[in-house]
């Protein structure tokens, strides 16, 4: 029966039924295969496909009918339409109340529904069965469809079939939105599938991997990433593109990570160094620590149940992985040299992941990680590049140590990698360029006759010029006073991974003089994530030029204040000499002068770098800060605020 060739008003004695299917934003939903069934005579059915969101059935029997829609058309068509903005009044309900039915007599009947009110058979997807089950109070478990009466126009607003996913901008250019998103995803790698963190004690699960993925699928906003409360930037997607996750944990080495995926992309997150130095296993007894004599003849303090320390995630990371800086040349990386500890950690995780990686080989790959996790993410990216040659492979790391030598960096220079450093984070400074803990490299029998210092230096340093180097394009957050930072993107730092003839010698903008000035306090994701979010907030409303100029002005004021403080302390020091001031107090004044002078030097370095940047058009974009070459979209600005 063609609904457009039937006239209700032309046939007032005949019964009819009109149905409209609308999205939450009052858009007509076409392509739905709708069937109405007479409740008194179930063999009496009619079927039409929605056009302009409508079907009209004429010449039908009076009585109760039930409308159902093919499950396939529901799942295919409804997910195409976006959700209504939160708090907005339903435009469907408003319009239905103002319009007359097909007979031009009564107002239309409005109903808010879900796909579960109409599907002719329930999908196998248990999530859909639970989250989109029917809400019709007259629904029947035995019979599919929505209960209706003849001679009515029903307007059905169908709940959007949508999910969330973190905002990922599809670009090879640096953008701060991606930096923030993958910082959260790197933090998520510290969670387990079921708990906020992997310490064997935590029972909280707001930031567990399964919790976050389930919330995104339900189109709910997660409020945690791991054990850190955080604001996720999200975009709405069709339900068929909702993310799923697989968690991996290898017990012997302690490697952990995940693959989050849909039909288009795969995100690999690798856990960094665990900050937990107690075993996840329950203690067997209360045995105390005791002193024993080691085979080497050196005294050691250990516990009877030594596994309480060595079996902890943090100790495994520290001893088995982080401190093993020997350079090895595995065949997987074409004979180039990598850090042995990081290699072993990565291969242990890969032994679990590998069977699933092949399922995603034609998708876009994104890899991320913090600290040790960044090292693992880089090595996995290299293996993915060699094995699958994916169309897109992008890597985001935070506080990542050096992973491979020059030969490794040269081989994998085409992997797009944005490497983030917070202030003077210590971890990116290690292993030092010259380090190699393979004690046999370059070792000669006559070396045993050298001094202990020389022998130790030879055993712990590299013996050739294929030294540790950083991979990736540097972005650095720099604090210029107690409350403010500036972001140096790869365009501003210009610390390239490889500039053809010369490998960059700097691994971060030189605002500190050495490792003694670097800080482990600035290493945690609880530092990186808020700092990146503050940059997003600031740069969503002003240009990078204005942001830098404000920083320069603040630095000039702070330098002037520090210089005045220095002169005041210096005058006090001069007056203290020879007037009987205790030596300890004089020493304190000298120490204070030294500290102030170091602050002045640091602030001058940052100011000088910023002045160079703002005077160079090649390093300073003219627009407000960007996702690629565009300003932030309004929907992202709203979430940031």
From Swiss-Prot:
Disruption phenotype: Deletion does not abolish killing activity. However, triple mutant lacking tseL, vasX, and vgrG3 fails to kill Escherichia coli. GO terms for biological process: lipid metabolic process. SUPFAM superfamilies: alpha/beta-Hydrolases. This is Toxin TseL. The gene is tseL. Keywords: Secreted, Virulence. It is found in: Secreted. Gene3D superfamilies: alpha/beta hydrolase (3.40.50.1820). It comes from the Bacteria. Interacts with VgrG3; this interaction allows TseL secretion to target cells. Toxin secreted by the type VI (T6SS) secretion system that acts on prokaryotic as well as eukaryotic target cells. One of its GO terms (cellular component) is extracellular region. InterPro entries: AB_hydrolase_fold (IPR029058), Fungal_lipase-type (IPR002921), Sec_MonoDiacylglyc_Lipase (IPR051218). Coiled coil: none annotated.
């Amino acid at each position: 029966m063609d609904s457009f060739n039937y006239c209700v008003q032309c046939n007032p004695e005949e019964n009819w039924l009109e149905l409209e299917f609308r999205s939450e934003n009052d858009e007509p939903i076409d392509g739905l295969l709708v069937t109405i069934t007479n409740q008194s005579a179930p063999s009496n059915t009619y079927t039409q496909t929605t056009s302009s969101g409508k079907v009209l059935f004429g010449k039908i029997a009076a009585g109760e009918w039930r409308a159902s829609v093919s499950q396939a058309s529901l799942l295919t068509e409804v997910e195409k339409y976006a959700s209504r903005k939160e708090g907005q009044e339903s435009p469907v309900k408003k319009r239905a109340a103002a319009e007359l039915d097909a007979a031009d007599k009564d107002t239309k009947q409005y109903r808010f529904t879900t796909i579960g009110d109409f599907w002719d058979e329930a999908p196998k997807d248990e999530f859909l069965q639970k989250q989109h089950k029917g809400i019709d109070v007259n629904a029947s478990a035995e019979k599919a469809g929505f209960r209706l009466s003849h001679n009515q126009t029903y307007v059905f607003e169908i709940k959007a079939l949508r999910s969330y996913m973190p905002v990922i901008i599809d670009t090879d250019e640096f953008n701060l939105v991606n930096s923030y998103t993958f910082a959260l995803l790197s933090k998520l790698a510290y969670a387990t599938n079921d708990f906020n963190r992997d310490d064997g004690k935590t029972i909280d699960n707001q930031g567990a991997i399964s919790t976050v993925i389930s919330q995104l699928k339900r189109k709910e906003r997660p409020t945690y990433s791991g054990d850190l409360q955080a604001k996720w930037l999200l975009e709405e997607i069709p339900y068929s593109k909702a993310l799923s996750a697989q968690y991996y944990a290898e017990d012997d080495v302690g490697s952990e990570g995940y693959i989050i995926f849909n039909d288009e992309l795969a995100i690999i997150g690798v856990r960094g160094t665990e900050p937990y130095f107690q075993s996840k296993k329950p203690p067997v007894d209360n045995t105390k620590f005791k002193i024993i004599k080691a085979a080497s003849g050196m005294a050691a303090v250990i516990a009877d149940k030594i596994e309480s320390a060595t079996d902890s995630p943090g100790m495994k990371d520290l001893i088995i992985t982080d401190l093993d800086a020997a350079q090895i040349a595995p065949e997987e990386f074409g004979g180039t040299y990598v850090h042995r500890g990081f290699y072993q950690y990565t291969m242990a995780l890969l032994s679990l992941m590998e069977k699933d990686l092949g399922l995603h080989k034609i998708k876009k790959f994104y890899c991320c990680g913090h600290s040790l996790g960044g090292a693992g993410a880089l090595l996995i990216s290299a293996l993915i590049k060699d094995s699958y040659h994916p169309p897109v492979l992008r890597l985001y790391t935070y506080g990542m140590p050096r992973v491979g030598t020059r030969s490794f960096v040269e081989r994998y220079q085409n992997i797009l990698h944005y490497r983030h450093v917070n202030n003077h984070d210590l971890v990116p400074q290690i292993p030092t360029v010259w380090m190699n803990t393979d004690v046999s490299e370059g070792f000669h029998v006559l070396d045993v006759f050298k001094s202990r210092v020389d022998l130790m230096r030879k055993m712990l340093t590299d013996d050739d010029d294929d030294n540790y180097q950083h991979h990736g394009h540097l972005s650095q957050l720099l604090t210029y006073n107690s409350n403010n930072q500036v972001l140096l993107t790869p365009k501003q730092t210009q610390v390239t991974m490889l500039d053809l003839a010369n490998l960059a010698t700097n691994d971060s903008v030189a605002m500190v003089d050495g490792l003694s000035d670097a800080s482990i306090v600035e290493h945690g994701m609880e530092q990186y994530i808020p700092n990146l979010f503050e940059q997003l907030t600031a740069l969503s409303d002003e240009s990078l030029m204005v942001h830098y100029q404000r920083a320069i002005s603040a630095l000039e004021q702070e330098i002037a204040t520090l210089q005045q403080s220095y002169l005041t302390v210096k005058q006090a020091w001069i007056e203290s000499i020879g007037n009987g001031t205790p030596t300890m107090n004089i020493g304190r004044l000298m120490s204070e002068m030294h500290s102030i002078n170091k602050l002045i030097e640091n602030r001058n370095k940052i100011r000088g770098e910023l002045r160079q940047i703002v005077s160079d058009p090649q390093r300073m974009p003219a627009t407000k800060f960007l996702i690629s070459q565009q300003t932030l979209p309004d929907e992202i600005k709203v979430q940031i605020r």
